[in-house]
Structure formats: structure tokens, C-alpha cells
Amino acid sequence: LAVNGAAAVSWPAELPRRGRSPPLEVKVMEKGRHYQQLILLAKDRNPIRTAIVHPVDASSLRAASEAAKAHLISPILVGPEGRIRAAAEQARLDLSPYDIISTEDSHAAAAQAVAMALDHKVDVLMRGALALDELMEFVDMAQGIRGTQRLSHVFVLDVPVLPRPVLVTDAMMHNAPSLAEKRDIIQNAIELSHALGIAAPRVAILSSQETVTPKFPSTVDAAVLCKMAERGQITGALLDGPLAFDTAFSESAAMAKGVVSLVAGQADIFAVPNVEAGSILVKELECLASAQTTDLIIGGRVPVIPVTRAGNMLAHLCSCALALLLVTHRQQALKKSIPA
């Protein structure tokens, strides 16, 4: 159908006025800013004597060198001297500022480094080019290093959407921790939080739900751990649990569920029920929230830096800063405990 004709178009005398749109709120979520703040916090401390165990590759030596340049550690290289110097030549690194303690192999390097820690010659152990299990075998055998509490592993995560770094523990060492082990794991993480300047950290004890039920033993453990904190068996923090991760992570999620909690949405420490849950949580935050991770083994007389992350130098420097902050925190606490 074809239509012929004319149409009259009129233009309004005055254009309609629209209300002014509110300004856009822009939040800049800089990746790594929490790590930078922790490194800055450690800058005013004296570098700590650190045994780099079996640093026979360029990656280990470069990581140690960068941490030394940042005035976080004073490296002592422990391992076969010939292989260490060959790796340094390949990486074009000058080893003249550092002491080298020559050993026959990685086994001897681990034994020597632990002996140095027992003799108070080093404050920290850092893994080089050897398996972590090989190093920890000697740490575990040395009663003077283990101390009264169990050793535990803690991840410190830089999650861009969060206003602070968060700790996840234990996602590496204790596969299915007992109640007593969980107590030590949490207390170790609390001590590290204090060293980072968090006076009263909030601990979320994670499980699959908030209701305590024997069907899920981790919920019962969480409730008991909270009672232990009330009785002074865990000190220096505010605990709540069991909490599902969404409740611990988001205050609005807790409100939607009707969960009243002083920890929800404000957790500094996420205590996971087992290694699998912790590992999954950390990897999810890495993949879905662009989190960066660094870690430390704590609870003993000297902290252990498990991985030299030359591929992510900021995370590696942060692990050295964590060790420095923990060591100096303990030194300050010891001074305060000695009567004047």
C-alpha cells in the first residue's frame, strides 16, 4: 500500500528540562596496594638476618637480592658455593655484599640453616631451590625452633575489592586439623595480625553454614573455638563461627540471613576447616577477585618464607616484610616483658 501526502512537523517552543544526573562514583582499586603498605610499614625496621637455603638458581638469588635492596633482609646464602656463584654469574648478580656458607648439597644446606637459627645467627629461613618438604623436615626435627605451639601456614591476600589485607589459614600444612591444632593455627594468625598493626583482629571461623550441627563437625569445632576464646584459651582477637564464607565476607549477606555478627563483613582472618577448603578459597579469590597471594610459615621461633617469588616480586617482598614485622614484633614484646 503506497500513501501520498504531506505531514506537518512542529518543534516545541522550549525543550524539556531534565534533572541533573548525580556524579558517577569512581573507586580506583589498585592491585597490590595493600602489599605496598605492608612493605612501607616494615621500612623503618632494621633488616633481618635471613638464611637463603640452597639458592642455586637465578630466581632464588634475584629474589634475595631484591629483598636486600629493599632493606628488608640481610641475606646469608647457604648451599654449594660453586653452584651459587655459577647461578649468580648467569643472572649477572654481584654476591660480594653477602656471606656464603658452603655446604655439600641441599640436605646439608637445610641442616646448616636450621642449626644457624638454633644458634641465633639468623632470624628467618627462606627456601631457595629445594623442596619445601626437605627444608621442613629439618625444621620439624629441631625442637628449639618448633617452640610450644604447632607450626602453621598462613596466606596473606591482597584483594583489590577489600579495604585491607586478609589472612587465610591453614591452607597448606594441616590437612584435617584437630580442635587443638585449630586453636594453635588461629593463635599463630592472631600473632601475625598484631605484628601487622591490627590490634584486635576479627576471626571468621568458616564452615558451610552458620547453624551448629553434628552433621558438619567443622560447625561444632567453630562453636567450641569461640567458647575457648571466651575462656581465654585463645587471646587477642574477636572470634565468630561457624560462618559461611558469604556471611564472613559480606555484612549485607549476614543481614539478609539474619545473622548478627561483629565479624561478618569485617574479618581480618579466615580460619578454614581443612587444607582443601582453604586452597579452594584462595584460588577462587585469585581467579575471581584478582587477589594476589603471599605466605609465611609461623608458630616456630623463626618464621619460614616458603617460596621465593621472583615472578611476582611485589608478593615476594611482602613475604619478607611479613617476616620482618613478625620478628621485630616479638623482639619488642620480649623487651616489654623484661622488668626495668
Language-model features, listed with the residues they occupy:
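Anion-binding alpha/beta catalytic cores of soluble intermediary-metabolism enzymes, centered on
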Residues: 26-263, 267-340
